[in-house]
Amino acid sequence: MNTKNSKTKLLWLIPLVLGTIYIIRREQQTPYNSIEGLIFGTVYHVTYQYDGDLKPEIEKAFKTFDGSLSTFNDTSAISKINQNKEVVPDSFFLNVYNRSMEISKETDGAFDITVAPLVNARGIGIKENQQGDSLTIDSLLQITGYEKISLAQGKIIKKDARIMLDCSAIAKGYASDVIAGVLQRHGVKNFMVEI
């Protein structure tokens, strides 16, 4: 009886081992693809292991995201909001906005998406080579503060038209998550997204 049980185990073990070897070899033979481009005024790199070409789908997702949250894109939703133009934010913008507001409340304003005027005054954002002095910074603080913006009927309401949003502290990570989602929908397990 013991010999029969051993043979049965062996019959199950052989296909299991062969299957595992096949899967490992196949994965090692799958090529890595790499693409790069520009988003948010910087470079992105995406490397992924997949038999097909996902470049068009990845670039489409980046383009959609850039059209929503890039302050470096004059036609993006966030740029239009900063220019006080009428815009209905898309789901990318709303997800980042809602999460930003949660974090702002949790940190008592230490995290704040209304910092664009301060970022620009230091030459970090869309306006380069400006070094705001302390008087300029103090005056800009009057038009910052997450509590000075709200969402009503799907639109951003600003208490002061000079308020500007900058979601880059969250947007780059969220864009990476969106691209990871694109890759995972295709069954890609090995990848790296860098922005």
Enumerate the language-model features and the residues they cover.
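Short, conserved phosphate/pyrophosphate- and ester-handling motifs at nucleotide-, phospho-/glycolipid
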Residues: K172
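Short glycine/proline-centered loop/turn elements that form peptide/ligand docking sites
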Residues: I195
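A contiguous, well-ordered beta/alpha segment that forms the leading edge of an enzyme domain
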Residues: N2-S168, G181-M192
